[in-house]
UniProtKB/Swiss-Prot annotation:
Chain's gene name: trtA
Protein name, entry field: Triuret hydrolase TrtA
Pfam families given in the database record: Isochorismatase
List of residues binding triuret: E72, K132, V157, T158, C162, Q202
pH dependency: Optimum pH is 6.5.
Length: 227
């Protein structure tokens, strides 16, 4: 077992029963000129974590973990997007409308693609999710159960919305979740900090948190003991 120094207490897992879930590292959310910046958000906090997420992906791949990527996306006819969701945010630029990188949050559009430097490789799962949580209206739970996954490492954007929602969904389904705190981000840094505190309050009510460096140290120690 790999032991990681974490909050609120050490987290333990085995690579064979663990998946890395990278949430919504999409061009429209992270790049200048995308949907996120068109709504008036400062995308720099999200762009800043890209190297950390890339390093996390490398670690997971080298350790032999399952890697899962999610994209918040909808069918071109928006049949999986309720009216209540379409009306949220800036009413002049909504889901399905043509934005700077094609139709917003629609499958197959340029802005809906995962950043090239974080692109999935052969054998990794890509989950197109119509909601904020990675488990809602997807087959993610079935895919994880089929592979006997019990533990999840979680990263991505935004911390307070899709990352938190996915962790809570996973917790309700029995997964032990560790969020990599410097591999997540929000347009609002205070939201990021407070969400991490919420997830790990009361003895880890939803899960654990740790920086990438602690994860790397734990994996390196395990590898040294099990060459």
């Amino acid at each position: 077992m790999i032991r990681i120094d974490a909050t609120p207490y050490p987290y333990q897992f085995h690579p064979r029963s663990t998946a890395l879930v990278v949430i919504d590292m999409q061009r429209d959310f992270i790049e200048e000129g995308g949907f996120g910046s068109a709504l008036g958000n400062d995308v720099r906090p999200l762009a800043a974590i890209v190297p950390t997420v890339a390093a996390l992906l490398q670690l997971a791949r080298e350790a032999g973990m399952l890697v899962v990527h999610t994209r918040e996306s909808h069918l071109p006819d928006l049949s999986d997007c309720p009216r209540s969701k379409r009306l949220r945010g800036n009413p002049t630029l909504g889901i399905g409308d043509v934005g700077p990188m094609g139709r917003i949050l629609v499958q197959g559009e340029p802005g809906n693609q995962i950043l090239p430097q974080l692109a999935p490789v052969e054998g990794e799962l890509v989950i197109d999710k119509p909601g904020k949580g990675a488990f809602y209206a997807t087959d993610l739970h079935a895919q994880l159960q089929e592979r006997r996954i019990t533990h999840l490492l979680v990263a991505g954007v935004t911390t307070e919305v899709c990352v938190q929602t996915s962790m809570r969904e996973a917790n309700d389904r029995g997964y032990e979740c560790l969020v990599i705190e410097d591999a997540c981000a929000s347009y609002f840094p205070d939201f990021h900090r407070i969400t991490l505190e919420m997830l790990t309050a009361q003895g880890g009510i939803v899960g654990w948190r740790t920086p990438l460096a602690q994860l790397q140290a734990g994996v390196a120690a395990y590898t040294g003991e099990n060459p």
